[in-house]
Amino acid sequence: MSHHKLQESYDHVIVGGGVAADKAARAINERTPDASVLIITRDAEGPVFRPDLTKGLWLDDSTTVEDIALGTADDTGAQLATGTTVTSIDPSSHTVTTDSGDSVDTVAYGTLLLATGASPKTLDGTGGTDGTDGTGDDRVAYIRSLSDYRTLREKVTAGTRVAVVGGGYIGSEAAVALNAVGATVDLYTPDERVLGHMFPASITDHLEEVYAAKGVTVHHGFQLDHLDTGDTSGTSSTALTLVPTDGDAVSADVAVIGFGAVLETGLAQDAGLALEDGGVAVDISLSTSAPDVYAAGDIAVFTDPLLGRRHVEHVDNAEQSGTVAGTNMAGGAESYEYTPLFFSDIFDDGYEAVGTLSTELDVVEDWNDDRTAAVVYYLRDQVVQGVLLWNTWDSVPAARKILSASKGGTLSVDDLPGSIPVGDGE
């Protein structure tokens, strides 16, 4: 919880403790170093580089918790209220109400940033805030915060049977991370292939082989109905039981849930801010419909110059939009005109991407000769909507140029192969 009593007012208040909040605080400090800034987060600790919760902390023995802490308060002078929830926003009076568990406070702001991000989608389909889905069982993990990571890491040692439920972005990474520390990992996906909603069969077939070779057992067509945590009243806990909608139940020592995420828009909605496509609508300055209230990161629905109105739940967008929002909160006049990238590594393979990757779109694949690297284009009505750079590096600017040229009608489908040099697979 907060280490210092809250002031009655601040020049700038930031709700959320992720990367967007960190970047906004830094931008404010750079422009107006004497401004008072309050960052409010329900997390127990300050902002960290969240991608490493499923990447570096597991895959690199030299990466420590201290390494991924962003040092926001120390670097910017912002006051950090951890373990604190914002219960309401009143745009008309320019105030927020907070609850730290010890006290309820009303704080006035000059400008306000909503950088509340997204919460893991829980077993009942809602967004979770405590990482336990209401079961009270810390063997059921959602990897969102540093606390989640610490709890999971304490539970997992070599040979621990871990069920990863969900074959999407988080599930695919979590399986790799847990395998790296010697856990016995079973990956359960309702789909025919891991990441099958994003990647064509040429890639997902390869990934199936890689997971198997590394010792991760993939189970397809597994739709989880409910999870039985058993009797944990004794000194030793029984195994978790995962019960599918169809087929036999399976057991595990720990379950990691990767169902996707739910945007945290409740505060904005209750305050009467304009919502759009499940997120918070912002203009080119990242201002919301309420005066002096901005939004950045996952929840912000912005105008991508190449792809139109969208929200993006990846760290690059959080960093870039947080910086622009913070600059404008401090009196700047920057425009957010950016097409974010995202990235991941799956064992020895990796990728960067821009735009929409969906196998519901038309796909054009361009492979190197030994089929270890590719550039994959995703099209709707012959216009490129996304570019996947599979084991192909330093090509994101080129991918953005492809999106722009295709949108402008100066690049045909036949021109795509060879337009971005394919990597060598290294």
Can you annotate each of these PLM segments?
Residues 34-36, 77-103, 107, 181-284:
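A Rossmann-like FAD-binding core segment of flavoenzymes
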Residues 136-160, 234, 242-243, 249-319, ...:
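FAD-site-proximal beta/loop scaffold in flavoenzymes
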Residues 2-3, 8-10, 299-395:
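Mid-to-C-terminal Rossmann-like scaffold of FAD/NAD(P)H-dependent oxidoreductases
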Residues 116-181:
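Glycine-rich dinucleotide-binding loop and its adjacent helix/turn
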Residues 14, 18-19, 44, 118-120, ...:
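Residue-level detector of alpha-helix initiation sites
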